A protein has these predicted regions:
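Acidic, amphipathic alpha-helical patches
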Residues: 19, 111, 155
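Donor nucleotide-activated moiety binding/catalytic core segment of transferases
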Residues: 125, 130-174
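A short beta-strand/loop micro-motif in the catalytic core of glycosyltransferases
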Residues: 27-33, 124-125, 165-166
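Helix N-cap/beta->alpha junction signal
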Residues: 32-35, 128-130, 169, 214
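Active-site and donor-binding regions of nucleotide-sugar-utilizing enzymes
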Residues: 1-65
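Catalytic binding pocket for nucleotide-activated donors in carbohydrate/polymer assembly enzymes
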Residues: 139, 171-239
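Conserved catalytic-core segment of nucleotide-activated headgroup transferases in glycan assembly
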Residues: 58-138, 212
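C-terminal alpha-helical cap of glycosyltransferases
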Residues: 244-263
């Protein structure tokens, strides 16, 4: 959620109209922290008191060691050739104004150049945004270590086997921070992207990792181990009020309370 959405994007391409109902009919919306509640209130067109920092149920899995082990066992059973590899997950968001125009520029990331620059124990998982129809070109010589999982495997589950995340403006950074995963932000089109979408925070001070602007800078940072990972813990603390794995319980209690009030 670093990028602006909903009513924050009034007047922007792909943004809503002032008269659109969108999310305004919600009785309540739940968020991960008080820090971001104001942004969701603005984006959804809700009053501040309708946005509650209960924590997000889907993040409970990141505090569940048994779930993590089950996912890891299943992944390596499915892809045994990756068991002893250093796994890099490339998960960029889409460009364009929405699902109908979404794309990821083919010339932004070249698998062959990326893999040639890194050690032989490196494996790459590619997970494009569901809106993107494009698929990466994977050279034959790398198909044992480079997997396009855009059409399979849940993104959050892939984080449990990830040693390094490469992304850009995607909200996956929030979930990745819960596992203290090192991150690199490949923002080759940062200024153009900002001009079209805007952000709730200054991107360069917001992200919990090093920003790179070219594929060469990207591989150089990986080889050097230069991820600026010290930014991850304060990021996690800022954007998650609850790290106890009990957000589902809080939301369930909230729903039951609402049901009782409606009777």
């Amino acid at each position: 959620m670093p990028a602006a959405f909903g009513f924050t994007r009034l007047g922007k391409a792909g943004g809503p109209k002032q008269t659109d109902p969108n999310h305004r009919m919600y009785d309540v919306a739940i968020v991960s922290s008080a820090e971001i509640a104001k942004h969701y209130a603005e984006g959804f067109g809700l009053s501040d008191d309708k946005v509650l920092a209960t924590g997000i149920p889907r993040t409970d899995i990141f505090m569940d060691p048994q779930y993590a082990q089950t996912v890891q066992d299943g992944f390596y059973a499915k892809y045994p050739q990756l068991r002893d590899k250093r796994i890099i997950l490339f998960a960029p968001t889409f460009r364009g104004n929405g699902q109908m125009s979404a794309y990821y520029p083919a010339d932004a990331f070249h698998v062959d150049e990326f893999m040639e620059a890194l050690p032989a124990d490196t494996a790459l998982l590619i997970k494009y945004h569901p809106f993107c129809p494009e698929r990466p070109v994977i050279p034959e010589g790398y198909k044992d270590r480079v997997l396009d999982l855009s059409d399979e495997d849940e993104l959050n589950d892939l984080l449990f086997v990830t040693d390094l995340l490469i992304t850009d403006y995607s909200s996956v950074v929030f979930e990745a921070s819960l596992l203290d995963i090192p991150m690199l932000f490949y923002a080759f089109d940062l200024f153009d992207y900002i001009s079209k979408r805007d952000f709730y925070y200054d991107f360069e001070s917001f992200v919990p990792g090093k920003i790179v602007f070219s594929q060469r800078e990207l591989t150089e940072a990986i080889v050097a181990g230069d991820f600026e990972s010290e930014k991850v813990p304060p990021f996690k603390t800022k954007f998650f009020d609850h790290l106890d794995g009990r957000s589902s319980r809080r939301v369930a209690d909230l729903i039951l309370r609402f049901i009782g009030e409606k009777k």
